[in-house]
Amino acid sequence: MAAVDIRDNLLGISWVDSSWIPILNSGSVLDYFSERSNPFYDRTCNNEVVKMQRLTLEHLNQMVGVEYILLHAQEPILFIIRKQQRQSPTQVIPLADYYIIAGVIYQAPDLGSVINSRVLTAVHGIQSAFDEAMSYCRYHPSKGYWWHFKDHEEQDKVKPKVKRKEEPSSIFQRQRVDALLLDLRQKFPPKFVQQKSGEKPVPVDQTKKEAEPLPETVKSEEKETAKNVQQTVGTKGPPEKRMRLQ
C-alpha cells in the first residue's frame, strides 16, 4: 500500500478565522468556507466561478462539476456543508461533509475511515496482549511450555520501599500518654526492679525485705544479746581473796 500524504489526509486538522465568528450565519457561512486560507476549500469548484461572475448560488444547479452547498444549519453554533459532484440538475454524488462548530471547521470522517480506525485500535490492543503474554512464556525440550513470572517479582523486590515520615506528636498527646502509663503502673506495679545498670533485676518483695527488717527479728536479736551477757556473768567465779599482810 502506498503511504498516505499528510496533506491529503484532512481528518486530523481544523481551521478557524476568529474575525468571521461574530457575523457567522446561514447567509455568510459559504463565504466563510471559501476563504483562501481554508485547506478544505477547492479553488476549482463551481462556487468560485459563480463568485467571480457575481452570480447567485441558484446557477449552480445549471452547472456540472464540484460544488459546495449548505446542508444543515443550527445557528449560531452548528453548520454542515457538503462537497458534491453535480452531473445534472437532478443528479449529484456526495464527496465529503464538513461541519462547523463555534466557527471551527472539521472534515467529517467517512464510513471507511471510521471502520479502519476502530479495527486498527482493536488489533493494536490484541497485539499488545499477545506480546505481553509471550514475554512470560518459556519452553524447554524436556519440560515443554510453561509460564514464568519471577522476573517481575524480583523487580518488585528491588524497588526501594518508600518509608512514611513519622509525624511528631502534639503536647496534648504526650501528656495524655504519660497519664495513661502512670495509671497503668499504679494498677499493675512491676514485679522486678533493676537497682543498678548491668545488674540482674530483683523481685520487688525481696528489695522491700532488705530495706525494712521486721520487728520480730530485732526483738529476737535483743534477747540473744541479753542471754549472752548473763552467760558470761555466770561463768565468772567469785572474786579471789587476797592474803592480808600482818
From Swiss-Prot:
GO molecular-function term, one example from the UniProt record: transcription coactivator activity
Superkingdom of origin organism: Eukaryota
Glycyl lysine isopeptide (Lys-Gly) (interchain with G-Cter in SUMO2), cross-linked positions: 208
Example of a GO biological process term: regulation of transcription by RNA polymerase II
InterPro entries assigned to the protein according to its UniProt record, in alphabetical order: Mediator_Med6 (IPR007018), Mediator_Med6_met/pln (IPR016820), Mediator_Med6_sf (IPR038566)
Biased composition (Basic and acidic residues): 206-226
Pfam hit, one: Med6
Stretch list, region Disordered: 191-246
Major place of residence: nucleus
The entry's keywords: Acetylation, Activator, Isopeptide bond, Nucleus, Transcription, Transcription regulation, Ubl conjugation
Residues recorded as bearing N6-acetyllysine in the entry: 236, 241
GO CC terms, sorted: core mediator complex; mediator complex
Function: Component of the Mediator complex, a coactivator involved in the regulated transcription of nearly all RNA polymerase II-dependent genes. Mediator functions as a bridge to convey information from gene-specific regulatory proteins to the basal RNA polymerase II transcription machinery. Mediator is recruited to promoters by direct interactions with regulatory proteins and serves as a scaffold for the assembly of a functional preinitiation complex with RNA polymerase II and the general transcription factors.
Subunit structure, interactors included: Component of the Mediator complex, which is composed of MED1, MED4, MED6, MED7, MED8, MED9, MED10, MED11, MED12, MED13, MED13L, MED14, MED15, MED16, MED17, MED18, MED19, MED20, MED21, MED22, MED23, MED24, MED25, MED26, MED27, MED29, MED30, MED31, CCNC, CDK8 and CDC2L6/CDK11. The MED12, MED13, CCNC and CDK8 subunits form a distinct module termed the CDK8 module. Mediator containing the CDK8 module is less active than Mediator lacking this module in supporting transcriptional activation.
Protein name, as recorded: Mediator of RNA polymerase II transcription subunit 6
Organism: Bos taurus (Bovine)
Gene: MED6
